[in-house]
Amino acid sequence: MVAVDYLLAGMISVLTGLDRVALVQIMISRPLVAGPLTGWALGNPLVGLEIGMLLELLWLGRLPVGAAIPPDDTQVAVGATVLAAGTGHFVGLDGMPLVLLSVLIAIPLGKFGQVFDKLARQVNDRLAVSGYNALMSGHTAKMERCHLLGLVSFGLASLATALVIVLVGTFVLFTFAPVLIGAIQEAGLSLQYSLILVGAAVLLGTTNVNRGISLFCTAFIGTLLVLWLR
């Protein structure tokens, strides 16, 4: 990867981060979209899609609505994709083992997204007071600047989260990849299925109990029918 690739990834980080909370909200911030979008910009959309699919289930029931500030799933997807696309050939990994290792490293680093998101909201609280005072004083231009600065604070929070994930994740990959390569390659398929099952459990946990039971029974019967028809 060259500097232009990292610049593109940074732009996608800011764009998807703004879509997550502050601007438009057309769902490009979802891992299932942010991952492939980052991968496409870096020339490897398949890696981004694999990362996005694994992360989407895990975070589908945790949205940044109201006062809720979950770990930043958007930047986890962006950061993990950058890690997988940019460091694989250096550590001697590719394919699903590299994807799994990148995801496992990026997920805990997503907690930094909560910290930066809280800081951005605190800054925006002060900007809201300044904007209100400016409006009451008749300074509409200053009020508009305060409004736009609120977008900047969220954008910088997203970029900072992605930077932490990429920088710390790269250090962890280069340091521990030689030790973890064997274990990841050996447990690759079972680990992949484990993440999918955990994601499915998280998703079912957010649904209505009666509806969840109905969905489970329908899926179970459908699977039996498919096996019987084969």
PLM features: residue spans?
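Short helix-perturbing small/polar motifs within transmembrane alpha-helices
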Residues: 9-17, 60-63, 75-122
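Small-residue-rich segments of transmembrane alpha-helices in multi-pass membrane proteins
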Residues: 33-42, 78-88, 217-230
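Hydrophobic transmembrane alpha-helices
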Residues: 1-75
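Helix-loop-helix junctions within the multi-pass membrane cores of secondary transporters/permeases
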Residues: 96-179
